[in-house]
Amino acid sequence: MTNTEDKPYCIIDILPEQVPMYSPGRYFTVLRYFSSRLDEIIGKFASLLNKLNCYCHLEVGWDSENYTDDFAPEALERLFKAANSSPDPLYIRVNSSDAIFVYANGDHYMTLYEPDSELLNLVRSLASAEGLFVWSPPSTPTDSPSL
């Protein structure tokens, strides 16, 4: 994936929406708390994707060019954990299309680039079942989509 800046995307997250920059809450304190529970969050991401793999063909890769679909369901969680100690993100391509999940080192969220409406609706349902949220960032270029 070379240029993601102009591609439509959504966030699969533990929070229901982006936290405003000047929120009166304790975002960083809460984020540190969830850092200690990252394995649990990764388990939810892996479970969501394993369920999605019942409906869609998934391929995983460490770069945006080379993918494999030869992975066991339990391997997905190990791949997420490996991404936490890697400078390279984990890519999960859907149906050999442009729709790609990206998970980077230590993040509490995944990004889904270029989902069509059918995929997005399915991901929303599966995320909800895992206690996760799917939201789209503000469309203004000055707002950062990352947590």
Where are these regions (language model features)?
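Structured alpha/beta or helical-core interaction and ligand-binding surfaces enriched in interleaved
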Residues: 1-109, 113-147
